[in-house]
Amino acid sequence: FFLHNVFGKHSKMFIGDAGTLSLGIIFSVFVTTILSTNLGVVKLPNNLGLIPFTLAVLCVPVFDTLRVMSARIARGKSPFSPDKTHLHHLFIELGYSHIGTTLSIIGINLFVVLCWFFAYKWGLSIDIQLYIVVTLGVFVTFIFYTFVKKQIRKESRVYYSLCRIAKHTHIERKGFWSFVQEWADKSISEEIRNI
């Protein structure tokens, strides 16, 4: 989905509810598999926190969902009611392209994973690793979202700086990007022809 939706011009895919539920099941299996590693077969270092690791990998989706659902409940709405308060909507509101939004969120998530990795490498306990991941998860979703929304309302310098950065995320599809776009579109059209 990522390659076609971000890079393809004619090969966009809509996964819908069934697709997102399927991805949720895949992520659940991933987390369950990681957490149920048979310690008798695989020797893991003492301070390797599997729960902090999986939470770091899924940090933005998990904490953004918690933030959005908490806000909906606080407003007296169903936690499942639709709105445009997810983190990716914030980037789009600032003027980021879809690829810029995607790469920004991936970058934020990678930052959390790297912080977990350094905490693990420095020999910090599993509890401290978990505290670091949870603190960063709250920071990159709850605090970051609230801060940027406030800057948008005030039309502050930070807001205009973020808008200037957003303009640079709209790239022309030439050179390497053109090659990737053609490949994504070609691969999907070959699959359709083979059906």
What are the residue ranges of the model-derived segments?
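Alpha-helical transmembrane segments
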Residues: 1-172
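Acidic, Ser/Thr-rich low-complexity segments on the non-lumenal side of membrane proteins
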Residues: 99-100, 173-195
